[in-house]
């Protein structure tokens, strides 16, 4: 179909030099996209015309950035740890975000569902309706929280002009299935892949590159010499060969960088691990 989009209307060509004009009713939210199109930041995709509506997809024109630093992100059940390196392997910054709010969201809705099940056990239709209602609310709250986390991480990525490295979690389900039932339940609630999707989407929207790295043994090996790390107290791991002690979450971000760059050493950051609740 040949057409000409003019912002507030669309002209559909029916024959040479003949066309029909359709005036568009747009909301204030949709007007923002039209303004971006007028400014040359968006392109028009394939228009779909239905009986009562017209779907006009916009495509953002993205110019890929030349990165100056590298950001590695390790996503855990209780926290998200990220490190930023320069291209020589010097650690510029390492931060751990505690994501306890996510656990609280799941726990609160789990308690609500238990109460509903007990109260309406003899009213299956009403029970089903309410369970679906609260499941929807839980999903929206979780996604809103994940959006906020990913937005913060991308703001950090833009500040340092980075390429982002994350774990390739393609086979995470197979690994999780070998764990206990309680562990599987907790991990199924924590949607790692959805957070990664939000991060990648926002990163590419701003022209940042994203790569995935095989996470095998990233939390078990010394990033300096490659020897196996041994437990050395709460959340700490020690390399008996290098005689160095690492935070278990931080070492994963170091090894992600090492795997992607094939480098053998790191220079410690000037300041220690920064902690933050999100």
Curated annotation (Swiss-Prot):
Domain of life: Archaea
UniProt keyword Metal-binding present: yes
Swiss-Prot/TrEMBL keywords: DNA recombination, DNA-binding, Metal-binding, Transposable element, Transposition, Zinc
InterPro entries noted in UniProt: Cas12f1-like_TNB
Positions bound to Zn(2+): 222, 225, 239, 242
GO molecular function, one term: metal ion binding
Keyword Membrane set for record: no
Any one GO BP annotation for this protein: DNA recombination
Family: In the N-terminal section; belongs to the transposase 2 family.
Protein name (Swiss-Prot/TrEMBL): TnpB-like protein MJ0751
Lineage of producing organism: Archaea, Methanobacteriati, Methanobacteriota, Methanomada group, Methanococci
């Amino acid at each position: 179909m040949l057409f000409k989009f003019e912002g507030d209307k669309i002209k559909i060509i029916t024959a040479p030099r003949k066309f029909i004009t359709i005036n568009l009713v747009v909301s204030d939210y949709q007007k923002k996209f039209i303004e971006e199109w007028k400014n040359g930041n968006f392109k028009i995709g394939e228009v779909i015309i239905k009986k009562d509506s017209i779907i006009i997809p916009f495509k953002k024109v993205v110019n890929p950035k030349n990165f100056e630093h590298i950001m590695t992100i390790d996503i855990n059940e209780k926290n998200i740890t990220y490190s930023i390196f320069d291209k020589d392997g010097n650690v510029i910054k390492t931060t751990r975000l505690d994501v306890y709010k996510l656990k609280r969201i799941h726990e609160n809705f789990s308690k609500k569902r238990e109460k509903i099940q007990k109260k309406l056990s003899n009213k299956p239709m009403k029970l089903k309706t309410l369970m679906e209602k609260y499941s929807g609310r839980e999903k929206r709250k979780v996604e809103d929280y994940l959006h906020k986390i990913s937005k913060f991480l991308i703001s950090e990525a833009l500040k340092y002009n980075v390429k982002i490295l994350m774990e390739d979690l393609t086979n995470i389900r197979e690994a999780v299935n070998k764990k206990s039932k309680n562990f599987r339940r907790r991990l199924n609630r924590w949607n790692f892949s959805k957070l990664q999707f939000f991060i990648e989407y926002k990163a590419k929207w701003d022209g940042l590159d994203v790569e995935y790295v095989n996470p095998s043994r990233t939390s078990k090996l010394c990033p300096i010499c490659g020897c196996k790390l041994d437990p050395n107290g709460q959340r700490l791991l020690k390399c008996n060969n290098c005689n160095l002690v690492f935070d278990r979450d931080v070492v994963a971000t170091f090894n992600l960088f090492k795997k992607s760059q094939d480098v053998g050493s790191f220079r410690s950051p000037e300041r220690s691990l920064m902690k933050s609740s999100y």
